[in-house]
């Protein structure tokens, strides 16, 4: 009899611990003063991501992104293309899912789907800029497009 009570108490404790751990706030990594200034920019900023040899182009019209890319993002060569491709796949899947759910996610943030095919080699530059846009976007708007926190360092 006591054994059954102990099992019930243990089960309740485990479930409570699990719920508390899972419901914790998932905040974006700390934002520096310099990064906040870039996020608060008002100047128009357009970045065109393209790979001339493969004829792929992405146009990002996001105020502050180009400045952030030049001043805060990790430099080219810091990440491998494979790393960025893997992260971009996860980010794109989550992004596109949010585009399809405008009642659940802000349709002003998630306007258009991204066509990113996993078996196409878009090249380093396209992956670099797309990856960094996802990091910028998550940090600026306090969003999570994957299971990992969007960090710079």
Q: Across the structure, where does each feature detected by a protein language model lie?
A:
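Solvent-exposed, polar/charged alpha-helical surfaces in well-ordered, non-transmembrane soluble domains
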Residues: 85, 89, 93-97
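Extracytoplasmic/periplasmic, Sec-exported soluble proteins
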Residues: 80-87, 125
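Sec-dependent signal peptide cleavage junction
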Residues: 22-61, 65-66
């Amino acid at each position: 009899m006591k054994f059954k009570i102990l099992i019930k108490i243990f089960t309740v404790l485990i479930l409570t611990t699990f719920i508390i751990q899972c419901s914790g706030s998932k905040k974006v990594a700390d934002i520096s003063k310099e990064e906040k200034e870039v996020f608060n920019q008002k100047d128009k900023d357009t970045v065109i991501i393209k790979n001339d040899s493969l004829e792929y182009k992405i146009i990002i019209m996001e105020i502050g992104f180009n400045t952030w890319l030049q001043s805060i993002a990790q430099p080219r060569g810091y990440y491998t293309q494979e790393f960025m491709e893997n992260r971009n796949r996860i980010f794109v899947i989550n992004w596109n899912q949010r585009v399809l759910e405008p009642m659940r996610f802000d349709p002003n943030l998630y306007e258009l789907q991204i066509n990113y095919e996993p078996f196409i080699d878009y090249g380093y530059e396209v992956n670099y800029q797309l990856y960094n846009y996802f990091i910028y976007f998550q940090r600026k708007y306090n969003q999570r497009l994957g299971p990992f926190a969007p960090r710079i360092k």
